[in-house]
Regions:
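Sec/Tat signal peptide C-region and signal peptidase I cleavage site
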Residues: 11-19
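Flexible loop/hinge segments at secondary-structure junctions
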Residues: 19-334
């Protein structure tokens, strides 16, 4: 009898959850920590809903949502007019949080915070500044003893929204960069070594003395990698923080109706200059009504209760006016 009861229990546990809905998404690594938190918390509230997410990079997220192979995509770069036209249906670009991309480094013998000018960052990533003791670096870092050591540049190897934010910033502050490299999720880098994902770049910086790369703030914090302050458009050196990112959004251009906006190099005196929104890419018409209803419910939860979880992971929450506009647009999701 005891064996029979045990057998029935095992059979019951092996059965799938009746009525469970699974949503699949893919895209940016930049917001993965907060997305992972959100999907987990939403599942606790709605055990019948499972949201899976692959952090494969913004380029992959755009490709997959365009092809219709996922229920939603994610990108740190809003889709272009051409990408939206190529999609099989209307795609909504919905901002979720704001974050910062930071110049993270591994400089032996330098323990203080390093300051970077826009010209120095552009020069390093173009290969024009090759030594850590170059005057372009030392002149604004009095008191720090930089080694006569080669600079190793680390960049993303995959299509990346983090790369777009970085190159969008460099294109705004350096005419040479804009004309020779430009901005995109994937560019022809003048030099350097490639790492896959924010995780890959962070790992390479940790392993390579003399290196510098760019990662989303939380990846520098989680990996205990030093990162520098950057001189903003107002002339102040600002280190990435929730306050600096929020200031960047506050002083940025007015949010357009489709939410596609860049806030890099914002003019505010307290603004961190390499900041950005990140977006979920949501089909206005889902494959079936049940999926659309769940997506809309999650999005409404995300712009309200979900925003309360952002600061713990070093993201800035959406400005109230943006969240309010977004709630109106979410009504289009079916």
């Amino acid at each position: 009898m005891r064996k029979s009861v045990l057998l029935l229990v095992c059979v019951f546990l092996a059965l799938p959850v009746i009525g469970q809905t699974t949503l699949n998404g893919a895209g940016a690594t930049f917001p993965y920590p907060i997305y992972s938190k959100w999907f987990s918390e939403y599942h606790k509230l709605h055990p019948d809903v499972q949201i899976n997410y692959q952090s494969i990079g913004s380029g992959g997220g755009i490709r997959q949502v365009t092809a219709g192979t996922v229920d939603f995509g994610a990108s740190d770069m809003p889709m272009t007019d051409k990408q939206l036209a190529d999609a099989k249906q209307k795609i909504l670009n919905l901002p979720t949080v704001l974050g910062a991309v930071v110049p993270a480094y591994n400089i032996p013998g330098v323990s203080g915070e390093v300051k970077f000018t826009p010209d120095a960052l552009a020069g390093i990533f173009m290969g024009k500044i090759t030594k850590w003791n170059d005057k372009a670096i030392t002149s604004v870092n009095q008191g720090l003893n930089f080694p006569d050591r080669d600079i190793i540049v680390v960049h993303r190897s995959d299509g990346s929204g983090t790369s777009f934010i970085w190159t969008d910033y460099l294109s705004k502050v350096s005419a040479d960069w804009k004309s020779s490299v430009g901005s995109d999720t994937s560019v022809k880098w003048p030099l350097g070594m490639g790492g896959k994902g924010n995780e890959g770049v962070a790992g390479m910086i940790r392993q390579l003395p003399g290196s510098i790369g760019y990662v989303e703030l939380i990846y520098a914090l989680q990996n205990n990698i030093p990162y520098g302050s950057v001189r903003n458009a107002a002339g102040a050196f600002v280190k990435a923080s929730l306050e600096g990112v929020t200031a960047a959004a506050a002083s940025a251009p007015k949010m357009p109706a489709d939410f596609r906006v860049s806030i890099t190099n914002s003019p505010g005196k307290d603004a961190y200059p390499i900041a950005s929104f990140t977006w979920l890419l949501i089909p206005a018409q889902s494959k079936n009504p049940a999926t659309g209803k769940i997506l809309a419910d999650f999005l409404n939860w995300m712009v309200a209760d979900g925003q309360k979880m952002t600061s713990a992971l070093s993201y800035a929450s959406l400005p109230d006016n943006v969240a309010a506009k977004e709630k109106d647009v979410i009504k289009q999701v079916k």
